[in-house]
């Protein structure tokens, strides 16, 4: 068990944080607040999977409870999306129902929230149990990057931990944010995927190439095949007769 003392920034308030979950603790499932949240999270994961970014040693998850014990009380906060660079792999067919940093792997390098139309808890800095999400990520978890997307208007905010406090970051000239721990850019893209039309979070590589979804790759291949067929016919070759 790892125990750390954390200064809260509030006078006379210190946290004792331990990274071990009691055996009898029952995880509470946080409901997904709207249909856009799982679609946004799945789209982020899909393009990473297609480039081979996902490995058993890396954790990319959505709506997964991040666990800590603070002053003897167990805290579970489910982020809409998270990335941890190194974790202890689970033996199949076990599924990960929660994640306890330091015990099961690294502190998440990136945590994300997609704003809902409810109480705006993603910005909550409540320093007392059960703690606001913003406060939990900044002071207790101390995740290096906290990303917030407002899906309706496409507003993207990124905060980086500096001396224990989140500082708002400015996008680069291309309008995107460089995430060094993933060697990728993160930005906003507007379009349609599945049944949803609107703003999406997308990845770009270091050369600013958009990481495509599966359906986009298929369309790219279809267009390439059409161009090849057109070229062959222009040369007097019938593609259907090529063995």
Regions found by a protein language model. Give the residues of each.
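C-terminal interaction segment
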Residues: 2-33, 50, 68-73, 84-110, ...
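Acidic-basic catalytic patches of nuclease active cores, encompassing PD-(D/E)XK
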Residues: 32-62, 69-82
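A structural signal for short, well-ordered beta-strand segments and their strand-loop junctions
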Residues: 59-61, 147-150
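Short, surface-exposed beta-edge/turn micro-motifs
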Residues: 79, 143-145
